[in-house]
């Protein structure tokens, strides 16, 4: 195996190290990722409220667990394992999901200010009016039970934004 052959493996290892460092920095290393709860309207409102209080254009690398135990055809690969809240886009906050093991690349979700989730899909401009000739992203509604948050992570998420009240 030459250096060129090792590039994808090294890139994956670097990604894993960065994920681990970020989790450690945010005190997330002890959380059991399989204890997920479905996204409810109340939880969606909570996440939207928190996102609305984040400084505009600030990149926030908070990782949330994505529950893939229930099949959602065409939305996520079965091994999708992390979501992070990214910088503000348009009228909502972009959630980018990473699925390196499936080879399917990166999917994007947008959490609107009213707590609704949308999937951002790349589309061919030939099939959609109002999109630039080179194509672009379109938002389509997605189900509310895709994202799972553990109670511990919800608490940490809240504490992250309110450090004075953190226990």
Predicted region positions:
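Short, highly charged
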Residues: 48-90, 94
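Residue-level detector of alpha-helical secondary structure
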Residues: 44-51, 150, 154, 158-161
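Arginine residue identity/basic-tract feature
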Residues: 9, 23-27, 34-38, 53, ...
């Amino acid at each position: 195996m030459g250096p060129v052959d090792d590039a994808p493996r090294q890139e994956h290892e670097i990604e894993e190290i960065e994920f681990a460092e970020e989790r450690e920095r945010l005190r997330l290393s002890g959380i059991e990722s399989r204890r997920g709860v479905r996204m409810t309207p109340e939880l969606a409102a909570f996440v939207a409220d928190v996102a609305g209080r984040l400084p505009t254009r600030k990149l926030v690398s908070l990782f949330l667990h994505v529950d893939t135990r229930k099949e959602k055809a065409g939305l996520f690969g079965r091994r999708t394992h992390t979501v992070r809240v990214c910088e503000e886009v348009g009228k909502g906050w972009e959630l980018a999901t990473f699925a390196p093991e499936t080879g399917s690349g990166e999917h994007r979700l947008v959490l609107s200010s009213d707590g609704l989730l949308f999937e951002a899909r790349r589309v061919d401009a030939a099939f959609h009016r109002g999109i630039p000739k080179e194509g672009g992203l379109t938002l389509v509604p997605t189900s509310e039970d895709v994202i799972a948050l553990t109670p511990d992570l919800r608490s940490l998420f809240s504490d992250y934004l309110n450090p004075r009240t953190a226990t």
